[in-house]
Amino acid sequence: MADALVGYEKEAGCVPILHPEEIKPQSHYNHGYNESRKSHVDDYSTWDIVKATQYGIFERCRELVEAGYDVRQPDKENVTLLHWAAINNRVDLVKYYISKGAIVDQLGGDLNSTPLHWATRQGHLSMVVQLMKYGADPSLIDGEGCSCVHLAAQFGHTSIVAYLIAKGQDVDMMDQNGMTPLMWAAYRTHSVDPTRLLLTFNVSVNLGDKYHKNTALHWAVLAGNTTVISLLLEANANVDAQNIKGETPLDLAKQRKNVWMINHLQEARQAKGYDSPSYLKRLKMDKEFRQKVMLGTPFLVIWLVGFIADLDIDSWLIKGVMYAVMWLVVQFLSKSFFDHSMHSALPLGIYLATKFWMYITWFYWFWNDLPFVTIHLPFLLNSLALFYNFGKSWKSDPGIIKASEEQKKKTIVELAETGSLDLSIFCSTCLIRKPIRSKHCAVCNRCIAKFDHHCPWVGNCVGSGNHRYFMGYLFFLLCMICWMMYGCICYWRIHCATSYTKDGFWIYITQIATCSPWMFWMFLNSVFHFMWVAVLIMCQLYQIAVLGITTNERMNARRYKHFKVTATSIESPFNHGCMRNLIDFFELRCCGLLRPVPIDWTSQYTIEYDQTSGSGYQLV
């Protein structure tokens, strides 16, 4: 038993890493004793106190202590009962031993560690909380110079890292060998956490260790930790920092011949202007310029497609060449300036460009052909409503869950000490307790209350703060598209010689396409946008009125315990009937005839809230 624990203790530690290339990150194995490993025996009366402690046999332990066993006495391997109870998460035994005089910070084992070190290595948050309540000091170092926060970071115990920092441990604390928690996380933990959590706590990313002067980015490169490299580059880690040998992270990546690391580090250097790139290269590295290109490209493409088709040139060969040139230009722009944010920027650019050219078409081609009072005036009023709702959907707060630094730490401590610091309800990026119905948006990198979805067409999340505006945007957009299609049909009736009743549909299509290719192109755009907007607004209304759920909840209902999911249906605790759902969502009052139930979803953590009975309206 002791040998297994000693092997575990030596698996990772804070000894000076004299030759980093010879040490590889190691996996964390559970070498503690738990119920699943308990052998089936009927009589514990012959067990010694160490074995009884390991397996959590409380009555046997109490019997031996009452018989005179000294709880401070270490075994032959210098391990105390408190150590064994801590590593095996025996909370009741820890309380009992401390009540009988056990020293909470007694050193023991091969690494001369405290029970808190052992609990931290094993990832027992509840035990860490319990020991610290009894006064255990997490800043004490073990025989290898490691404090608890360093152990938690290198073993990937994110919840323990969060708790220790929230309780006052320095996020940049160096162990005896000058390694910070961030360095250990970068070197040993190949996942986003706890690195992401440490970065959220404003850790210093450019500190160097004591022996090699390696920064966290150096250590991530040495470990081939691509996940952490990406996080550190996003956090503006110094890509030109040199270690004691004068090596930068890029030099280390080249030594390891890792193409991915080399490319990303070179791009980061170029983005900072370190390599004196050409003018075109600087433009490519300019994030703001790339964003403008991605937003502007749809304006160019939509115009060129219609403009080339509308040219008074009989030769389709010439037009084909022009389209080929356009395609090459777009290919150049996409390869040079489009990046991972294109999935958000392009849809927004397509929407803005389509509406821009539709309005140009309306005012230039339709203005003199259609009556003002019955057509233009309603169109203009609808446009004002569309612009307002689009602006609110695009720029307003969708329901961002905010908290101060002190509030975040207080939340972490409260959750940990109540046994609920679970990453399913705690966001390690925003460091907040996630309210019910909220979700962290990977695009916006923030937690949104009553999260519905991230909409690239408005460039923002849709949540409790702007969902009603989003529905207004969809409705008025659909009306605008219908007006646009009506305007195209009126234009063809007035300006084009057509014979639909005589020649049929396909001849009619060729007639209107040749009469005004630009108008036909605008009509096709209108039809395309009509289809997705109509489908989206119907889906949204169905979810809001009939199901009482959001898009995120509908897609991930099986992940949430408060939904009852069958093969054909989803039962939502937030569904209070069609009428009630609509009144609450749109906050309809009708001069006081209706009474919606306001809920602050940024601070609602349970499904129990004040929801009055009835149909959702009340006559007064």
UniProtKB/Swiss-Prot annotation:
Effect of deleting the gene: Morpholino knockdown of the protein does not apparently affect embryo development. However, the motility of morphants is markedly reduced from 3 days post-fertilization onwards. This is associated with a significant defect in the axonal outgrowth of spinal motor neurons without affecting neuron generation.
Localization terms from the record: Golgi apparatus membrane; Cytoplasmic vesicle membrane; Presynaptic cell membrane
Positions of the catalytic residues: 455
Membrane topology: Multi-pass membrane protein
Keyword check for Transferase: yes
Domain DHHC: residue ranges: 425-475
GO molecular function terms noted in the UniProt entry: protein-cysteine S-myristoyltransferase activity; protein-cysteine S-palmitoyltransferase activity; protein-cysteine S-stearoyltransferase activity
Regions crossing the membrane: 293-313, 314-334, 346-366, 370-390, 470-490, 505-524
Record topology, Cytoplasmic segments: 1-292, 335-345, 391-469, 525-620
Keywords, comma-separated and alphabetical: Acyltransferase, ANK repeat, Cell membrane, Cell projection, Cytoplasmic vesicle, Golgi apparatus, Lipoprotein, Membrane, Palmitate, Repeat, Synapse, Transferase, Transmembrane, Transmembrane helix
Gene3D superfamilies xref list: Ankyrin repeat-containing domain
Residues on Lumenal side: 367-369, 491-504
Assigned EC number: 2.3.1.225, 2.3.1.-
Modifications the protein undergoes after translation, according to the UniProt entry: Autopalmitoylated.
Reaction equation(s) it catalyzes: L-cysteinyl-[protein] + hexadecanoyl-CoA = S-hexadecanoyl-L-cysteinyl-[protein] + CoA; L-cysteinyl-[protein] + tetradecanoyl-CoA = S-tetradecanoyl-L-cysteinyl-[protein] + CoA; L-cysteinyl-[protein] + octadecanoyl-CoA = S-octadecanoyl-L-cysteinyl-[protein] + CoA
ANK repeat placement: 77-106, 111-140, 144-173, 177-207, 212-241, 245-274
SMART domains for this protein: ANK
Family: Belongs to the DHHC palmitoyltransferase family. AKR/ZDHHC17 subfamily.
Domain notes: The DHHC domain is required for palmitoyltransferase activity.
Function: Palmitoyltransferase that catalyzes the addition of palmitate onto various protein substrates and is involved in a variety of cellular processes. Has no stringent fatty acid selectivity and in addition to palmitate can also transfer onto target proteins myristate from tetradecanoyl-CoA and stearate from octadecanoyl-CoA. Plays a role in axonogenesis.
Stated name of the protein: Palmitoyltransferase ZDHHC17
Organism, scientific name: Danio rerio (Zebrafish)
Gene: zdhhc17
